Protein backbone atom coordinates (compact mmCIF):
# COMPACT_ATOMS: atom_id res chain seq x y z
CA UNK A 1 0.00 0.00 0.00
CA UNK A 2 1.45 3.33 -1.00
CA UNK A 3 -0.48 5.72 1.25
CA UNK A 4 -0.90 5.61 5.03
CA UNK A 5 -4.12 4.09 6.36
CA UNK A 6 -5.00 7.35 8.08
CA UNK A 7 -5.15 9.17 4.74
CA UNK A 8 -7.59 6.74 3.11
CA UNK A 9 -11.05 8.15 2.46
CA UNK A 10 -13.67 5.45 2.81
CA UNK A 11 -17.01 5.38 1.04
CA UNK A 12 -18.68 3.14 3.64
CA UNK A 13 -18.02 1.40 6.95
CA UNK A 14 -19.19 -2.07 7.95
CA UNK A 15 -19.18 -2.64 11.70
CA UNK A 16 -19.31 -6.40 12.29
CA UNK A 17 -18.21 -6.10 15.91
CA UNK A 18 -19.51 -8.98 18.04
CA UNK A 19 -20.59 -11.09 15.05
CA UNK A 20 -19.19 -14.52 14.26
CA UNK A 21 -18.71 -16.58 11.11
CA UNK A 22 -20.45 -16.55 8.69
CA UNK A 23 -22.21 -13.24 9.47
CA UNK A 24 -19.30 -10.80 8.88
CA UNK A 25 -18.61 -12.17 5.38
CA UNK A 26 -22.31 -12.32 4.51
CA UNK A 27 -22.69 -8.67 5.54
CA UNK A 28 -19.49 -7.79 3.67
CA UNK A 29 -20.86 -9.35 0.49
CA UNK A 30 -24.00 -7.20 0.67
CA UNK A 31 -22.11 -4.02 1.60
CA UNK A 32 -19.67 -4.43 -1.32
CA UNK A 33 -22.62 -4.82 -3.70
CA UNK A 34 -23.87 -1.41 -2.57
CA UNK A 35 -20.51 0.30 -3.20
CA UNK A 36 -19.74 2.08 -6.46
CA UNK A 37 -16.97 0.55 -8.61
CA UNK A 38 -13.57 1.25 -7.00
CA UNK A 39 -15.33 2.31 -3.78
CA UNK A 40 -13.44 1.84 -0.52
CA UNK A 41 -14.99 -0.02 2.40
CA UNK A 42 -13.65 -0.16 5.95
CA UNK A 43 -14.60 -3.29 7.89
CA UNK A 44 -14.41 -3.52 11.68
CA UNK A 45 -14.61 -7.05 13.09
CA UNK A 46 -13.87 -8.95 16.28
CA UNK A 47 -14.09 -12.51 14.95
CA UNK A 48 -10.54 -13.88 14.45
CA UNK A 49 -11.76 -16.04 11.56
CA UNK A 50 -12.09 -12.84 9.50
CA UNK A 51 -8.27 -12.86 9.27
CA UNK A 52 -8.66 -15.86 7.00
CA UNK A 53 -12.10 -15.26 5.49
CA UNK A 54 -11.88 -11.63 4.35
CA UNK A 55 -8.61 -11.96 2.37
CA UNK A 56 -10.02 -15.09 0.69
CA UNK A 57 -13.26 -13.24 -0.07
CA UNK A 58 -11.28 -10.49 -1.80
CA UNK A 59 -9.18 -12.90 -3.86
CA UNK A 60 -12.17 -15.01 -4.87
CA UNK A 61 -14.29 -12.04 -5.99
CA UNK A 62 -11.48 -9.87 -7.39
CA UNK A 63 -11.60 -7.03 -4.85
CA UNK A 64 -8.42 -5.43 -3.51
CA UNK A 65 -7.52 -5.82 0.15
CA UNK A 66 -5.84 -2.43 0.46
CA UNK A 67 -4.83 -2.84 4.11
CA UNK A 68 -5.50 -4.86 7.21
CA UNK A 69 -4.64 -4.10 10.80
CA UNK A 70 -5.14 -5.84 14.16
CA UNK A 71 -5.65 -3.78 17.30
CA UNK A 72 -5.93 -6.04 20.37
CA UNK A 73 -9.10 -8.06 19.64
CA UNK A 74 -10.35 -5.83 16.81
CA UNK A 75 -9.52 -6.49 13.17
CA UNK A 76 -9.69 -3.71 10.58
CA UNK A 77 -9.79 -4.13 6.80
CA UNK A 78 -9.86 -1.66 3.93
CA UNK A 79 -11.31 -3.20 0.78
CA UNK A 80 -11.50 -1.57 -2.64
CA UNK A 81 -14.30 -2.90 -4.80
CA UNK A 82 -13.19 -4.05 -8.21
CA UNK A 83 -14.03 -1.71 -11.04
CA UNK A 84 -16.61 -3.19 -13.38
Swiss-Prot record:
Predominant localisation class: cytoplasm
Query: HAMAP family, from UniProt?
Result: Thiourid_synth_A
Q: Which PANTHER family match?
A: SULFUR CARRIER PROTEIN TUSA (PTHR33279:SF2), SULFUR CARRIER PROTEIN YEDF-RELATED (PTHR33279)
Give the keywords, sorted: Cytoplasm
Active-site residues are: 21 (cysteine persulfide intermediate)
Q: What is the protein name given in its UniProt record?
A: Sulfur carrier protein TusA
Q: Name one GO molecular function term.
A: sulfur carrier activity
Gene Ontology biological process terms in this record: tRNA wobble position uridine thiolation
In the record, the note on similarity to other proteins reads: Belongs to the sulfur carrier protein TusA family.
* Organism (species): Pseudomonas syringae pv. tomato (strain ATCC BAA-871 / DC3000)
Record keyword Cytoplasm present: yes
Q: What does this protein do?
A: Sulfur carrier protein which probably makes part of a sulfur-relay system.
* Localisation: Cytoplasm
Amino acid sequence: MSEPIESLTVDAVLDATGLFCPEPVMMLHQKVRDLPPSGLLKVIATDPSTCRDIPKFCVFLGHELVAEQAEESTFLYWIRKKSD
